[in-house]
C-alpha cells in the first residue's frame, strides 16, 4: 500500500505585528501562510514523506501564493479546489513580557468554510493513500464542514485508510449552535490515532 498521507484543512493568511507591537500600534504586518493541517503536511514532507493537502482556495493571487507556498515544501496540491472569494485571515500579536499573545480571526465566508458534502472527490484522492489526517478545527467552522469531515472519514474508513485526528479544540470557533461534544464525539469513534491534551479530550467527550 502507498505511504501517501492526505491532510485536510484551511490554509490561512497570517498577519503578525512586528517588533512585539500591539495591533493598534502597527502600520505594517508580517505576512505568512499556514494552518494546523498545513503545518502537519509540511512536517511530513520535511521528514521525506509523501503528502497531499486538501483545501479550497479563492481563485486569485492569494490562492496562487498558497499553492506556491505548499509546493515549495514538496506538498501535493493537485486536488485543491478553487472557488469563493475569500482567504481565511488572522491577525496575531505575539506574547511579550507580561502580555499574552492575542489572535483575531477573520475567516467567516472564506472559500474553505463554504465547502459542502459532494464537492470533494474523496475516492479519487484516497485511492493511493494510506492515512487521512483531519482536525477538530475543520468541523468547528460550519455545519457544512462538519458534514464534509464525516463524509471524508466514512469514505476513508471504507477504503481501509488509517484515520489520524487532532482534537485541536478552539472554544471561540464553535459558534453555529452545536457544541464540540455533539459534533466531534461521533466523528472520533472512527479515528485510529488521536492527538490532544487530557483537557481537550475531556472537553470533547464529556
How would you name each of these model-derived features?
Residues 1-76:
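Glycine-rich phosphate/adenosyl-contacting loop at the front of the ribokinase-like
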Residues 7-8, 79, 105, 164-165, ...:
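General beta-strand structural signal in soluble alpha/beta enzymes
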Residues 11, 84, 109, 169-171, ...:
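Glycine-rich beta-alpha junction loops
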Residues 20-23, 67-69, 119-120, 146-149, ...:
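Short, glycine/charged-enriched secondary-structure capping and boundary segments
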Residues 32-39, 117, 176-179:
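Short secondary-structure boundary/capping elements
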Residues 50-136:
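Conserved N-terminal subdomain of the carbohydrate kinase-like
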Residues 131, 137-206:
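Conserved beta-alpha-beta core of the PfkB/ribokinase-like small-molecule kinase fold
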Amino acid at each position: 500500500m502507498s505511504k501517501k498521507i492526505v491532510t485536510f484543512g484551511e490554509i490561512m493568511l497570517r498577519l503578525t505585528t512586528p517588533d512585539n507591537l500591539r495591533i493598534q500600534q502597527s502600520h505594517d504586518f508580517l505576512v505568512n501562510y499556514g494552518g494546523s493541517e498545513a503545518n502537519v503536511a509540511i512536517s511530513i514532507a520535511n521528514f521525506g514523506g509523501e503528502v497531499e493537502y486538501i483545501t479550497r482556495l479563492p481563485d486569485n493571487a492569494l490562492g496562487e501564493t498558497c499553492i506556491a507556498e505548499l509546493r515549495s515544501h514538496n506538498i501535493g496540491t493537485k486536488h485543491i479546489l478553487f472557488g469563493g472569494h475569500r482567504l481565511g485571515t488572522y491577525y496575531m500579536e505575539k506574547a511579550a513580557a507580561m502580555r499574552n499573545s492575542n489572535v483575531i480571526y477573520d475567516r467567516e465566508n472564506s472559500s474553505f468554510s463554504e465547502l459542502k458534502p459532494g464537492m470533494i472527490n474523496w475516492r479519487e484522492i484516497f485511492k493511493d493513500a494510506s492515512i487521512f489526517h483531519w482536525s477538530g478545527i475543520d468541523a468547528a467552522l460550519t455545519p457544512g464542514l462538519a458534514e464534509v469531515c464525516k463524509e471524508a472519514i466514512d469514505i476513508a474508513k471504507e477504503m481501509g485508510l488509517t484515520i489520524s485526528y487532532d482534537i485541536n479544540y478552539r472554544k471561540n470557533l464553535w459558534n453555529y449552535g452545536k457544541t464540540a461534544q455533539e459534533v466531534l464525539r461521533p466523528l472520533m469513534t472512527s479515528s485510529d490515532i488521536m492527538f490532544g491534551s487530557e483537557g481537550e479530550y475531556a472537553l470533547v467527550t464529556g
